[in-house]
Regions:
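Residues within membrane-spanning alpha-helices of integral membrane proteins
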Residues: 5-12, 60, 81-88, 92, ...
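Transmembrane alpha-helix/helix-exit interface in multi-pass inner-membrane proteins
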Residues: 10-31
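Perimembrane loop-to-helix junctions flanking transmembrane segments
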Residues: 29-44
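Membrane-helix boundary connector in multi-pass membrane proteins
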Residues: 74-85, 90-109, 128
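Membrane-water interface at the C-terminal end of transmembrane alpha helices
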Residues: 116-137
């Protein structure tokens, strides 16, 4: 579970870099407008490059800061691992959906596939007990 969590955090860092490099923040209003034709109440989100970059830096910093706690197996490490696994599952699925809606590549879609698959393994790892019967932490 710990190694998978480290891999997921590193993949999120790469995912953030891909989103920034290829302008995710510029393309979200376009996708929001397309989705809004199907779901009229769907919000159209937009933000500046600076805000988007700062949010991604903060996210990666928080995840990196959580690594020692998860690696040591602290009391709430399983909860942290599961929460990130769920978030990355939906993040990956959302990016792949946006690529389909866009009709091709959408910023973040390449690494989203890895996030999605890795999140499934991370979530599965939180459900498996250790061979000696002690839950993994």
């Amino acid at each position: 579970m710990r190694r998978l969590y480290i891999a997921l955090v590193c993949t999120q860092a790469l995912h953030s870099a891909e989103e920034i490099a290829f302008g995710f923040y510029r393309r979200t209003p376009e996708i929001g407008a397309r989705i809004q034709t199907i779901i009229p109440s769907f919000p159209i989100l937009s933000m500046s490059a600076t805000v988007f970059i700062l949010l991604n830096i903060a996210l990666v910093a928080i995840l990196a800061a959580s690594l020692p706690f998860v690696y040591r197996g602290t009391k709430y490490s399983r909860v942290m691992v599961r929460a990130l696994g769920i978030a990355e599952f939906y993040n990956g699925a959302a990016h792949m959906t946006m690529a389909v809606v866009a009709g091709g590549y959408f910023p973040g879609a390449a690494s989203a596939v890895v996030l999605f698959v890795l999140s499934v393994f991370v979530l599965r790892s939180t459900l498996r007990p250790e061979p000696n019967g002690v839950p993994r932490s």
